[in-house]
Amino acid sequence: TMDIREALKERILILDGGMGTYIQQLGISYDGNNDALPLTHPDVLERIHKDYINAGSDIVCTCTFGANAVSQHGYGMSDRCYDMNVAGAQIARKAANSCTDRKVWVMGSMGPSDKSLTIIEMMMDPEETVTFDVLEDAYFIQAKGLIDGGVDGFIVETVTDGRNAVAALTAINKAQQEKGTNLPVTLSASIMNASGCIMAGMSLAELYGSVKDYNLMSF
């Protein structure tokens, strides 16, 4: 099968659209934790992936944006994160493989989590338990689940803090080393306002500077 990196040299690849907004449109009743849906509503997610593929997407992203132990803490589901990621990847893979007329790739979605390491480090709150190592460990479990579920690569999505992004990229590298894989990684950032900065106050140039050594497929 063609590596996504090779395909990108030849043509522009089309990513899918929003997952959360589509789930809301379908009116599924659930507790608001999108990342548990691979375990509870796999059929719904498969349908969404297939709808995007039928609309022309070359790449579908797993429904695992917040499937890390830090983000899942509030839902009491931190211990299910590995399973969420395996299931999320398997569902997207099944949808991608059902497309017989062309190749569709699966990217494992890893969001910024609901914590900002830069802000935590500035606040120095003695009650705060999330550190760089805690977040990196959470991303490590997520990345291993995505690899085991069969992704073609990773998308570190809507980065809001360069420190968080480095934690995710470090974890992906460690997971790939352990699993013996060399899957591509892409990164996207969320710009807050006209200043062109991300939430933690970094410019895109500063963010790029902090992640450029990670051999990203795209930024």
Model-predicted segments: where are they?
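Domain-level signal for soluble alpha/beta catalytic cores
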Residues: 1-218
